């Protein structure tokens, strides 16, 4: 039975003010992707043919200019019995304000910042039949202090919000790199596929891929079995050589992309498809504080830029910036996925940035003098930084990651954020322009 959270509103207000830490477990950080039922739909991003996909456009139930809860938006979704063997995820972006999520009257997340597209695992909170999903706009002072100077996106409210379900035995995350071999003769695909078995029983799945060169030629394909115990995750690693690849090295002057399709099979039956564009690119940094591509320093002409209201306008503006000699864009916060797709295709570098901007008290290094040194905000900092990284990691245009806009102070939270990104083993630079000689930046 659906349960509206609008009716017991006082309960909602109290829960938002004192959310249990366990609720935060619904939110996850991983590569942004959808599972398509057909290969052609995957290639063309045709979502209307995805059987278990629901667009989210909730209606306003409550609004106020005062208090901790400023608005409540609700939508009733119907979960059929056929979803029992699937994991359901809620993707949110373009909410317009900081918010939290309720499902059937139960709060499942801490407050989420309005700037970072997010994903939540909602299966444990759904019932068979009608369910009420609520997006509750909140006014939490600490949220605004973490992101003081970041403008709200100009896109339509709730655009690209959706629920989709993927099989309980399926791909959970993917890390893709196309890197040169040790002698720079050709490329090697580094494809790490994290597989999840949410069943209690032992299961076997087939995971496959095929990769096509920029000219459309099939380069390689493979299908492997993976036996998994119940309630477990494992990673399949593929490392095939990709020959005749040096002419396809990705750069603004040569933005060539390979097409990679991941898919899963069970008992010979194709289950799900996931498409990716992959660029042959290797980035790092040297001891002179320069970002490098294939070991050579890049000469960057950088511009601050956030995506426009829609994809077509953004592509037009990015092309115009490139025509003026700009070769690197620096957004102030994570962008819609199509922004990175555009930059991959058009050929322009991007230094991505977490949704952190706290100039107030930036010079105060006492505890809580700056948000960056308020330990009770650590979880919010780490989630913003990790989500930024996971969403952008597979794009050829991404040459480095910024912990925060500067100045945003420095301290415990940004130290831990730097350590977190370093733990992922990425060769790309981690930058914080407000480090002021401290150790939590690779480039000063």
Mark where each language-model region is.
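Substrate-binding/catalytic cleft of secreted carbohydrate-active enzymes
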Residues: 328-444
